[in-house]
């Protein structure tokens, strides 16, 4: 919100880190215009949308709610990391190509469920659905490569039935931060 407060916070971080012999990385630490009024201020000055930043596996963006136009922060999984995860899954699927489908399905379920457990935050549902769809497509490609005869049997409809059987459904499991903090206040944790 306030540039002076943000600068003071950065100085305090430098001081605190120095006590433990640590330093903030200059290329990864910067002040950006972000927050409740950033969109309005940038529109007033005819500037583009507020900058985004990556933190803890998510790209954070200033946004407004569709219904009321209130400020909110959208968190989307970092695209580069999603691609890297899908590439690792693809490599593992190729190694497990001739394993029984049920065994591969159980393995995929645990991998996808672990990914969803972390990334299932509000405003990220599109990324979750896309991730599960991509895993399904990768699995279909590997199944079709198993034999020449089996290629025509494995249609997208059949693969979707198999995916529904083995892969978890993408859904938001983490609450909005304000709901989480409200629960902590009621419990007396803060």
Segments the model singles out, each with a brief description of its role:
Residues 1-190:
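Non-catalytic terminal/accessory segments
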């Amino acid at each position: 919100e306030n540039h002076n407060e943000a600068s003071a916070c950065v100085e305090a971080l430098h001081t605190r880190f120095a006590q433990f012999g640590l330093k903030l990385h200059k290329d990864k630490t910067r002040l950006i215009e972000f927050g409740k009024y950033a969109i309005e201020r940038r529109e007033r000055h005819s500037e583009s949308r507020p900058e985004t930043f990556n933190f803890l596996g998510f790209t954070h963006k200033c946004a407004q709610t569709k219904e009321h136009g209130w400020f909110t922060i959208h968190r989307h999984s970092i695209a580069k990391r999603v691609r890297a995860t899908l590439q690792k899954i693809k490599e593992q699927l190729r190694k497990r190509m001739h394993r029984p489908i049920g065994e591969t399905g159980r393995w995929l379920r645990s991998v996808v469920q672990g990914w969803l457990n972390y990334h299932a935050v509000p405003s990220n549902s599109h990324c979750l659905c896309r991730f599960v769809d991509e895993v399904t497509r990768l699995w279909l490609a590997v199944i079709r490569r198993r034999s020449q005869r089996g290629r025509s049997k494995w249609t997208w409809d059949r693969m979707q039935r198999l995916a529904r059987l083995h892969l978890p459904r993408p859904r938001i499991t983490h609450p909005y931060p304000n709901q989480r903090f409200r629960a902590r206040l009621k419990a007396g944790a803060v």
